[in-house]
Amino acid sequence: NKFFDQQPIPNLKVKQSDVAALCHSMRETAKKNAASDFQRQEIKELTVNQLISWGVLLEHKGQLIPTYAYAMLTHQAGYPPVVQCAVFKTEDRAVFIDKREIDAPIQEQVEKAYQYVLEKINMGARFQGVYRQDIYELPPDSIRELIANALVHRNYLEPGSIQIALFSDRLEVTSPGGLMRGVTPEKMKEGFSKI
């Protein structure tokens, strides 16, 4: 079985400048997210062979063939579709306060959508002794997970955009496509999973 992102994408050419920029971007992202200086120093340059082994590129008769993963990571051929973000005044979509479309490579979409939500949600504070700790109204780790899962696990064969809607009482992340066959919201609430 092959995954959608490992399928070759028709009519897209691989440019060495795009491959170099992708390798650089992925390395910089890894360095930025490293937990320590030691980990940062251990991060090596990425190579075309690594992209091939990960299924980002395919090799056929000495030619590099782009996959949908390559298109999403380099933001080419309309992939990934834009992420639509909005803040609504109340508990419905009648009046929006702010909106933004994020049209970027998939790794930037995750980060920019996450930062957008953090900018728009309320922040409070908790005091421990003489120290103040800022606390978001929603857990940032959960927000990041929702957004990353929506982008990574969406059905890219379905048209449409991922929508991130912040209401006065909740955050909704909507992804095109439906649930897997045999999965219903009721079953999910009872712990059912196809994973």
Language model: regions and residue ranges:
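Active-site helix-to-loop segments that bind/position phosphate- or nucleotide-bearing substrates
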Residues: 1-195
